[in-house]
């Protein structure tokens, strides 16, 4: 349908443009800001801002996160942590040093067997008794770090 006037011309001459005689589209009919969020604006708050109102649980101050984080490595995997060039150079006098913390482990456990006649020094934060015994029997040594 064609019309002579564009929409914005239609209300020319009508003083308050449909916004009333006294208020004339002024002030704050719904309250200022977030007023009425629990009452007359509840639908808007529930739809677009869920969880804005209500309580949340307490915070735990000084919580020791990851207190018991202790990745482990077994004896049978230790020799595979040594680089190939270091393995080739190792002798009875020049034994390789394995720092398990650099590989992301904290504790060494005693599962498995060490390779024959291949002593080495193990550096770890924690070590089990059986692992320490097996390393020392193979001629190696254990260094504990903080």
From Swiss-Prot:
Entry keyword set: Ribonucleoprotein, Ribosomal protein
What is a biological process (GO) this protein takes part in? Answer: translation
Q: Where is this region: Disordered?
A: 1-35
Judging by the UniProt lineage, the source's domain of life is Eukaryota
Which SUPFAM superfamilies does the entry link to? Ribosomal proteins L15p and L18e (SSF52080)
- Pfam families, A to Z: Ribosomal_L27A
Question: HAMAP family of this UniProt entry?
Answer: Ribosomal_uL15
Q: What is this protein called?
A: Large ribosomal subunit protein uL15x
The encoding gene is: RPL27AC
